[in-house]
Amino acid sequence: MNAKLLSREVNKGTGAPVIGVFAPCDPRIDQASRERSINIVKSAAQKLASKIKQPDGKAVDIVYSDILIDAESQADQVARQFKEAGVNILVCVPDTWSFPQLTTLSLMAHFPKDTPINFTTGNSAPRPGVVYTHATAGAIAQFGKLTHINVGKWPDTGQAPEMDDQTLENLVDWCYAAITFIGLRGRRVVVFGHDSMGMETALAHVLETRNQFGLEITRLDMKLLSDMLQKESYDKEELKKLRSWLEGHAKDRIELPELEKDSELLDKSLALYLIVRDLMVELDAVGGGFMSQLEWGSDSRAIQQPVADIMESLFNSTFDHN
């Protein structure tokens, strides 16, 4: 058998957040309660599908299994279903008691330890899922993983109970945190320069950030930006477009006390945005940090560089000249 050469074209959806919704059950429980559990799984998944979107507005894939996890064999089956669908976030909606080791723990064994998992449950019911939730969360904590518990409300009776609005809101909030975690994993932020304030909050903790979030920190020297400004390593036509756009929106509020000098510095500030933006695209970065302190723009021993405030404002906005 020959080795397979992979295509250089990668599906853009590879590694995207996918939420899998499931429920455990107890094989001794009556059929009506089992059907109710399946309906809760379906309802929770449908509600999330209508609420969860990525930053670009595209819907996040939500999948669910109507196989109730009674024991290890069902846990394996649902886990494989989820893995085929690319699931990397787990939402468990238990409505009955069950056995943690035979159910969710066996399912979790198929996934990386840092896979986000949420338990959303009602607070009572004849065979309370909330008891299962706390027992399972305790078992998971004992092997060194934290989970999120959302004890909410849905009707104790009826075959198709719906979680109330607050329960759903809490679950949706958690899902957004989870898709952010998954979306950042394997990505990077770019940090230019060092910290000159001596503040702990300004230090880039490379190892902890990698271990906790799977997020890399690319560190670049400020010299690169200084050189690229000097070499005018940016699209000059785009700079004109950006300056025109800025003046079109804020011309009366732009103060240039030393007209020619300050106008040139304004252009450099805008050029800095274009340079850093292109570097971030090149590195596939999702964010960054910039040391805009004494030696960059104010040290009389050096060449004055443009203030980075405009660049920062544009990066923290959802729009620019494009």
Model regions: which residues?
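An N-terminal assembly and electron-transfer interface module characteristic of large anaerobic redox
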Residues: 1-322
